[in-house]
C-alpha cells in the first residue's frame, strides 16, 4: 500500500492507496512544532484503527506547503515505517511544463493538483480551483503547460481576519447561503463570505479563460475542503476532493 501525505497550512490530509484505489483518508491538524514521534505514532494509529496494517505500507509520498514540517515528517516515515519518503518538489518528474517565471515558486500542492487533473482529463484545457486555507487558481493547457494562476485568501482566513481585526464581528460557521441579504450580523458575515468568494471564483475563472484560452471554455475543476459549498452554483464542471492525493500518487509512480 501507498501512503500519501498532503501537508497544508492548517492540516495534514492523508490518503492510503491500495494500488490506484484510495481505501482510507484522514486528517490531522498540522503544527510546525510537532515531533516526528507524535506524527509517526498518529499515522500508524490512524491506519491501524481503521482496519489496515501499517506494516503493509511500502511507499510514502509527501507534498508540503510548510517547509519546516518536512524534516520531522521524513523522520516519522523513517522511524515508524522504515521508509524514505518521496517528496514532491522541484527537480522531480511531473509530466508538466512549468511556465512560471520562477518554477521553484509553484506550490507542491498546485503541482499535484495539476498532475492529477491532466491525468484524469488528458487533452483538455483546465482551470483548477482549490479552496483551502488559501484559494488557488491554476491554468493548465491541453499540452500540459502549467501556465500560472491566482491566489486569494481562503474562506476561513477571511472569516478569521474579520473576527481578529474588528471589535464586534464574531466568528461564524462557514456555510452555503441562499440569500445575499443578511438580516442579522452572523447572516451578513456568512453571506459576504459565501457570495464574495463565489464572485471571486466566477470573475477569476472568466478572466483566466480569456487570457489563457482565448475565450475557449476550459474544464473547471473544484477541489479542497470548501469546494462542495459551491456545488449548487454550477461554477465547477467537476468536484474532485482528493485531487491532490491522486496527483501525489501519480508523481510517485512517475519517479519510481
From Swiss-Prot:
Binding residues for K(+): 130
Compartment(s) where it occurs, according to its Swiss-Prot or TrEMBL record: Cytoplasm
Pfam families noted in UniProt: Pan_kinase
Pathway: Cofactor biosynthesis; coenzyme A biosynthesis; CoA from (R)-pantothenate: step 1/5
CDD domains in the cross-refs: ASKHA_NBD_PanK-III
Biological processes, Gene Ontology terms: coenzyme A biosynthetic process
Alphabetized UniProt keyword annotations: ATP-binding, Coenzyme A biosynthesis, Cytoplasm, Kinase, Metal-binding, Nucleotide-binding, Potassium, Transferase
Reactions this protein catalyses: (R)-pantothenate + ATP = (R)-4'-phosphopantothenate + ADP + H(+)
Keyword Protein transport in record: no
Cofactor(s) in the UniProt record: NH4(+); K(+)
Annotated Gene Ontology cellular component terms: cytoplasm
Residues that bind ATP: 6-13, 133
Residues annotated to bind substrate: 100, 107-110, 185
Residues at the active site: 109
Origin superkingdom: Bacteria
Keyword Nucleus attributed: no
Cofactor note: A monovalent cation. Ammonium or potassium.
Enzyme Commission no: 2.7.1.33
InterPro entries tied to this protein: ATPase_NBD (IPR043129), Type_III_PanK (IPR004619)
The protein's enzyme class: transferase
Subunit structure of this chain's protein: Homodimer.
Entry function: Catalyzes the phosphorylation of pantothenate (Pan), the first step in CoA biosynthesis.
NCBIfam families: baf, PRK13321.1
UniProt family annotation: Belongs to the type III pantothenate kinase family.
Protein name in UniProt: Type III pantothenate kinase
Amino acid at each position: 500500500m501507498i501512503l500519501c501525505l498532503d501537508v497544508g497550512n492548517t492540516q495534514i490530509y492523508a490518503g492510503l492507496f491500495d494500488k490506484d484505489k484510495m481505501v482510507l483518508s484522514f486528517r490531522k491538524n498540522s503544527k510546525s512544532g510537532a515531533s516526528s514521534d507524535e506524527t509517526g505514532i498518529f499515522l500508524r494509529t490512524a491506519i491501524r484503527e481503521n482496519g489496515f496494517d501499517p506494516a503493509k505500507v511500502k511507499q510514502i509520498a509527501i507534498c508540503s506547503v510548510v517547509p519546516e514540517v518536512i524534516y520531522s515528517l521524513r523522520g516519522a516515515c523513517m522511524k515508524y515505517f522504515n521508509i524514505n519518503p518521496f517528496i514532491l518538489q522541484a527537480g522531480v518528474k511531473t509530466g508538466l511544463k512549468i511556465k512560471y517565471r520562477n518554477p521553484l515558486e509553484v506550490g507542491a500542492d498546485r503541482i499535484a493538483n495539476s498532475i492529477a487533473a491532466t491525468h484524469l482529463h488528458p487533452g483538455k484545457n483546465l482551470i483548477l480551483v482549490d479552496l483551502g486555507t488559501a484559494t488557488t487558481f491554476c491554468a493548465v493547457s491541453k499540452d500540459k503547460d502549467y501556465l500560472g494562476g491566482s491566489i486569494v485568501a481562503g474562506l476561513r482566513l477571511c472569516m478569521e481576519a474579520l473576527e481578529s481585526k474588528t471589535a464586534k464581528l464574531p466568528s461564524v460557521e462557514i456555510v452555503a447561503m441562499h440569500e445575499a441579504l443578511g438580516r442579522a450580523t452572523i447572516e451578513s458575515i456568512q453571506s459576504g463570505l459565501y457570495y464574495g468568494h463565489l464572485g471571486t471564483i466566477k470573475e477569476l475563472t472568466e478572466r483566466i479563460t480569456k487570457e489563457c484560452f482565448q475565450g475557449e471554455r476550459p474544464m473547471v475543476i473544484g477541489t479542497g475542503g470548501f469546494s462542495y459549498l459551491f456545488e449548487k452554483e454550477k461554477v465547477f464542471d467537476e468536484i474532485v476532493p482528493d485531487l491532490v492525493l491522486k496527483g501525489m500518487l501519480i508523481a510517485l509512480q512517475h519517479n519510481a
